[in-house]
Amino acid sequence: MTAILVTGYRSFELGIFSEKDKRVAIIKKAIERDLIAYLEEGVDWFIFTGNLGFEQWALEVANDLKKTYPLKTATIFAFETHGSTWNDRNQQQLQQFRETDFVKYSYPSYESPKQLKSYHHFLIHNTDGAYLFYDSEHETRLSYLVAAMKEQPCYPLSFLNFERLNDIADE
């Protein structure tokens, strides 16, 4: 079994507030290419943390690829309360993560920063690498997870970046 953690920018961090935004189609095209490459290398699980934006689009692509490839998806939420204060539209989108092949919560609710560090440790030590849409020049709170990943020897990271998206848009 090979599992890849999939994470990246949330939609609002990219200034995307509608699924009809043309950038979403470009991002999904890149995701599809990358997930197919992973599948052809033998990856059989894609692991998500339940964030809207890149993860949501990757989950949608993965679900489409299930028609052709034998793959599984999992969501490991940091907290059982994840998304509980979101509006109805976002709650509906979050439901996709709750319907993956495997769903678990690390903690009932947030109590301290130590929980997030432990959660990151768990994600890294229970996956075989990560696929990220992240650029260190445009930092978000994802930087903590990326830093923890980079500290691990033999933990491969594959980045989708803005330059590659521009190339795909120009095709």
UniProtKB/Swiss-Prot annotation:
This is UPF0398 protein SEQ_1788. Belongs to the UPF0398 family. Pfam families: YpsA (PF06908). SUPFAM superfamilies: MCP/YpsA-like. It comes from Streptococcus equi subsp. equi (strain 4047).
